[in-house]
């Protein structure tokens, strides 16, 4: 699954250029077997692409490769004159076998002020128009507010902006959005869409714990875009975690994943990787935003041929997935914030993440980050896991925040502060064995200097004056404590030498029964007891392996996306208590290739 497939459909898509076929061709039987797709149409898209029959026919032909099941039609004003137009377009689409719902972008001029009667009147008028036509309305993620007008500041009083705005938006949107729509159509369903920028949700008025019960359904964003250059810098794997975390919290109310290609010209593979996260998270529906940006003459339409080429592969992938998704339990209370998108970065180094709202109690290992500080009892709960003989994996920033508890005594830190840079790492291979690793360029980390004993540095960063802690592991209170120091540039996690990443992944071998070996930028998604999906999100081909316990079979391994047998080789780990005897299943992944590895 990579770029060259797009070339195979370029000529075909030329046939779908905006020209008018004689009539709309019925498409009721033209659906994906394993995924459901939908298209958001702004009010401008409705006017330009769907209002006139000849334009609509051309648009439906152009978007035919997406095999859409549904359209979301935006109403951009409160003018009642929009009602007959929306009714006509919706009726024409339904006649072609499509589902059709309404859509509202709450404001026309940036974030709303919920203390401004004009803004509230505009919101009401928009949804009242939509409720005359549709049984369901989805709300674009401009429901938030950043207003700091005199009224908002005065009304906030001594509250934090997060507490004030999350209450204000919930209360006012109930009155001026949900109730306003139901005044027109009592049974209308209103769906809230949560943006990808989870770290600012409550600060700007989104409150998942409060709003998911309030609304009839939930759509969760996967606007990861181009991770290294787009201004939000969201790792692609975050899109998967957000679906499992926020969508999973919604239960039966989880309706869809929502993705876009904003500022992604020339980043075709990153765009379709958003689709991949939705498919692997098993999103009930995938919404593409929006028709206008995927359609000529917009420059962003350059992403569309590759998207169209990849959709059959994603449908096939969805059909291959068997059993429940598995991952490393990670404590992520709803509404929490911590190290920015740390769950996405961990996923991008091959650690599959299973977000948990409460502290995991039934697992061998679990990950804790600063997000866990949303739980006021977190130190005691982590210590209880340790006393129960469990393994806890902590980020260094979390351990710093909890140093007044017993956790502050886990490591013997003799000096810290500032940063340290070096190209040389050292991994601990056994009681007296270590291995130096030259990364080829310097990496910068917060400086953590430990005493020689107890020897806790499984991975150190080597400078002339000391080995500094990167991955620290020690026993304490009958349990195992792992502490990960995060690089100054978080994206450098993906660039760490494979040997360093392998040491980090080894912490979770007993929990997962499998570990990835190889470079970063390759994500692992286990399903059931015998299926392992690998997604190489690098621009280069990568050699990777899946390592299993020595009792795993050595014959019968298959990769089912391409259809090939895979070799399995016993790995002799030597002698002694640190020896590891494993079964190695190796394969090479092309750029942005997805592989589905199945055990016998």
Cite the ranges covered by each PLM segment.
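Positively charged n-region of N-terminal signal peptides that target proteins for export
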Residues: 1-4
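Glycan-processing catalytic domains of CAZymes
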Residues: 23-378, 384-387, 396-404, 469-477, ...
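Sec/Tat signal peptide C-region and signal peptidase I cleavage site
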Residues: 19-21
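Residue-level detector of bioactive/disordered segments in secreted/extracellular proteins
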Residues: 13-14, 149-154, 427, 433, ...
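Bacterial N-terminal signal peptides
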Residues: 6-17
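A conserved amphipathic helix/loop scaffold
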Residues: 370-600
């Amino acid at each position: 699954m990579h770029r060259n497939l797009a070339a195979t459909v370029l000529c075909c898509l030329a046939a779908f250029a905006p020209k008018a076929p004689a009539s709309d061709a019925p498409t009721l039987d033209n659906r994906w077997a394993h995924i459901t797709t939908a298209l958001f149409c702004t009010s401008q898209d409705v006017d330009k692409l769907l209002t006139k029959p000849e334009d609509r026919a051309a648009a439906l032909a152009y978007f035919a490769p997406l095999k859409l099941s549904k359209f979301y039609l935006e109403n951009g004003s409160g003018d009642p004159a929009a009602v007959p137009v929306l009714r006509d377009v919706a009726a024409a689409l339904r006649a072609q076998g499509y589902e059709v719902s309404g859509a509202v972008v709450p404001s026309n001029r940036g974030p709303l002020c919920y203390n401004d009667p004009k803004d509230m009147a505009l919101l009401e008028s928009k949804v009242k128009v939509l409720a005359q036509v549709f049984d369901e309305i989805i709300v674009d993620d401009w429901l938030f507010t950043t207003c700091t007008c005199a009224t908002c500041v005065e009304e906030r009083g001594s509250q934090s902006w997060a507490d004030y705005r999350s209450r204000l938006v919930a209360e006012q949107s109930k009155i001026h959005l949900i109730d306003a729509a139901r005044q027109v159509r009592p049974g209308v369903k209103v769906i809230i869409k949560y943006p990808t920028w989870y770290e600012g949700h409550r600060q700007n008025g989104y409150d998942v714990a409060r709003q998911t019960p309030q609304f009839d359904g939930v759509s969760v964003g996967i606007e990861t875009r181009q991770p290294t250059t787009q201004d939000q810098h969201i790792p692609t794997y975050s899109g998967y975690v957000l679906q499992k975390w926020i969508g999973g919290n919604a239960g039966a109310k989880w309706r869809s994943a929502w993705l876009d290609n904003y500022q992604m010209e020339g980043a075709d593979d990153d765009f379709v990787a958003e689709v991949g996260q939705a498919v692997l998270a098993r999103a009930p529906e995938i919404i593409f935003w929006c028709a206008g940006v995927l359609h000529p003459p917009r420059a962003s339409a350059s992403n569309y041929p590759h998207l169209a080429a990849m959709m059959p592969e994603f449908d096939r992938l969805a059909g291959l997935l068997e059993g429940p998704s598995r991952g490393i339990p990670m404590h992520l209370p709803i509404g929490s914030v911590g190290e920015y998108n740390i769950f996405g970065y961990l996923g991008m180094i091959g650690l599959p993440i299973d977000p948990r709202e409460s502290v995991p109690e039934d697992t061998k290992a679990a990950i804790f980050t600063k997000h866990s500080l949303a739980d006021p009892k977190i130190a005691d709960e982590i210590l209880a896991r340790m006393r129960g003989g469990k393994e806890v994996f902590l980020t260094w920033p979390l351990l710093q925040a909890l140093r007044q508890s017993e956790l502050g005594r886990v490591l013997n830190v003799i000096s810290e502060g500032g940063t340290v840079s070096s190209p040389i790492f050292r991994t601990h291979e056994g009681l007296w064995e270590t291995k130096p690793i030259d990364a080829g360029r310097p990496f910068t980390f917060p400086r953590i200097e430990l005493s020689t004993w107890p020897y806790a540095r499984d991975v150190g960063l080597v400078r002339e004056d000391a080995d500094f802690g990167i991955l620290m592991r020690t026993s304490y209170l009958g349990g195992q404590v792992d502490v990960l120091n995060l690089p100054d540039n978080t994206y450098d996690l993906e660039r760490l030498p494979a040997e360093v990443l392998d040491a980090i992944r080894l912490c979770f071998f007993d929990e997962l029964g499998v570990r990835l070996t190889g470079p970063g930028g390759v994500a692992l998604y286990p399903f059931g007891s015998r299926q392992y999906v690998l997604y190489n999100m690098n621009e280069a081909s990568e050699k990777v392996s899946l390592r299993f316990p020595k009792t795993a079979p050595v014959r019968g391994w298959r990769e089912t996306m391409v259809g090939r047998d895979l070799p399995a080789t016993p790995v002799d780990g030597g002698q002694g208590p640190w020896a590891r005897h494993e079964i190695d299943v190796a394969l090479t992944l092309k750029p942005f290739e997805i592989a589905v590895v199945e055990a016998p």
